[in-house]
């Protein structure tokens, strides 16, 4: 069950993990930010799991690499 989900919280996780000071582009993916590498993506997903009390399986961990894909996946877990 998805706990306390909001899109703004999800964006905050991305901004915190990627150390983005300004506006975050919701159409972004792993190739759009220099510091959004596989380790950062892993940390983003771990932070999302912790914040919203959900779990990603191993297939999701390797496939989710854009904000929109992650947003859709998180919403499906509700």
What are these regions (language model features)?
Residues 2-36, 40-46, 51-78:
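Phosphopantetheine-dependent thiolation modules in NRPS/PKS and related acyl-activating systems
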């Amino acid at each position: 069950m998805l706990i306390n989900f909001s899109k703004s919280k999800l964006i905050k996780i991305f901004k915190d993990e990627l150390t983005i000071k300004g506006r975050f582009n919701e159409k972004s993916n792993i190739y759009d930010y220099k510091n959004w590498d596989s380790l950062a993506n892993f940390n983003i997903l771990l932070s999302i799991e912790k914040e919203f009390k959900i779990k990603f399986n191993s297939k999701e961990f390797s496939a989710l690499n854009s904000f929109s894909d992650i947003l859709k996946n998180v919403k499906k877990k509700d």
